[in-house]
Amino acid sequence: MEKTLIIATRNSGKTKEFKKLFADFGYEIKDLTDYPELSEIEETGTTFEENARLKAEQIAEITGQVVIGDDSGLCVDVLGGLPGIWSHRFSAPDPTDEKNIAKLLHELAPTAITPERRSAHFHTTLVAAKPGRESLVVEADWDGYIALAPKGENGFGYDPIFMVDAFRTAAELSEKEKNQVSHRGQALRKLMAELPEWLYK
């Protein structure tokens, strides 16, 4: 069985989560930092699946390897699903996690006294690609609310403002807790249920 998978990302936080989640399955995980000669794949899609496919399928063609493309984002209901596929670039032109969070909290300021209007979910689409093979696609969501201010030291991205229950943000969960319930953890378990058969059908 092929035991090396390339994750189509240079995001160290994302790679760390994948390594942790795949460890139980005995896979070696590489990411695009292991392939510095590969140019950046532009995310020109209009959906999570289109972007995940672009990354996975293009890099699979170039490397000849099995590649997992991940496109994830935070979708806030009152903002019509934004930041969505633009989550990582929400505070462009020079986005950082801190600036993305600050912009989102600013956009949600009018809803501060109505927490029920701050409902949101994280979404992940994973695409497994291999040359000459129809890609495998799985998706998952993680429901929650947007906090009034960042809390917690763990995780990355919008985790410090994503309330997973009445008391804690995603950044206050341990790695193990987060991986059991998160959008990426759920999607990965779906992927692992189908990946072995897909690799060899």
UniProtKB/Swiss-Prot annotation:
GO terms for molecular function: dITP diphosphatase activity; ITP diphosphatase activity; metal ion binding; nucleotide binding; ribonucleoside triphosphate phosphatase activity; XTP diphosphatase activity. Its EC number is 3.6.1.66. GO terms for biological process: nucleotide metabolic process; purine nucleoside triphosphate catabolic process. Keywords: Hydrolase, Magnesium, Metal-binding, Nucleotide metabolism, Nucleotide-binding. Mg(2+) binds at E42, D71. Pfam families: Ham1p_like. Its cofactor is Mg(2+). Substrate binds at T9, R10, N11, S12, G13, K14, S72, F156, G157, Y158, D159, K178, H183, R184. One of its GO terms (cellular component) is cytosol. The keyword Isomerase does not apply. Binds 1 Mg(2+) ion per subunit. It is an enzyme of class 3 (hydrolase). Pyrophosphatase that catalyzes the hydrolysis of nucleoside triphosphates to their monophosphate derivatives, with a high preference for the non-canonical purine nucleotides XTP (xanthosine triphosphate), dITP (deoxyinosine triphosphate) and ITP. Seems to function as a house-cleaning enzyme that removes non-canonical purine nucleotides from the nucleotide pool, thus preventing their incorporation into DNA/RNA and avoiding chromosomal lesions. Homodimer. This is dITP/XTP pyrophosphatase. It comes from Lactococcus lactis subsp. lactis (strain IL1403). The gene is ynbD.
